[in-house]
Amino acid sequence: MRATINFIVSILIFITPVIAQTQPLDAFQQNKRLGRGVNILGYDPIWRSRDQARFKEKHFELLKKAGFNSVRINLHAFRHMDKDNNWTLSKNWFDTLDWAVEKATANGLAVILDLHEYNVMAQDPGGNKEKFLSFWRQVSEHYKNAPDSVFFEILNEPNKALTPKLWNQYFREALAIIREKNPTRIVIIGPAFWNSVDHLDELELPQDDRYIIVTVHYYKPMQFTHQGASWTNQRDKVGISWGTDAEKNAVRADFEKVNAWARKNNRPIFLGEFGAYDRAPMESRVRYTDFVARTAESFGWSWAYWQFDSDFILWDMKKDTWVEPILKALIPETK
């Protein structure tokens, strides 16, 4: 009898670590994994042709070496879907995305697949709903066996006609599709009104799904962060500085409000976008970037800077090098 008991105990000792290792990480653990991130590939010609890519394999390695933990891949996918074939995503599109996921993962970077079709969805939610749900049906099937370092973000910045009430309906339908094949994969969801910090109370998450990370975006004050941007009414307003005590206190107050919501609802927070347009004075860009990143980290949030290249620039493609002041603001040098 004693021999039998000893045998059973030895078996339990052996299998317990195996069972523990197979338990999925919870959303808070996974949020730590995201850590410090950056938005990539949204407007890169790589989606037209791999031969035209600005972002190369080496950039994944450079991001990791610089101290980043994750990438948020911005996917403008609707143009790559075949209307006459049930909105099927093209093989070339999936091949490109597979390459990016593979190279990011190989370099130890967590990956967020962010459906970035916010403008189209905002203009006509009903007319684009079929595409929206078809996208997640295909992507969730395609990546059902991907490592748990691959995250899904249902939609970037729902806004305008995609109201809080309608958004709560749409994301739940997409989430149900995802959960069919990805029951424990982390899904990132943010509030309507451009993932605004002021609209979290209108986000109605399913209480029984704890594999969700909540995202907010932060560009306040817009007159500073978007000065000189061609798509805004700030096109000709440049030279605006940032960094007074009052301005810092405003950021801190907004983040404290988000953190209070997060504690009340027991949800981790991912600051999915922040930054200042590259026509803002560099010293103020640095102050703003550093302050927002450090304040987010003080609350235990993960974050992703907007963005790697193009505007809000972190990497200068022409010079093939980092914009060092912004890099150091994001990833301070350890002493």
Model-derived segments and their meaning:
Residues 24, 133-247, 252-276, 298-304:
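Active-site region of glycoside hydrolase catalytic domains
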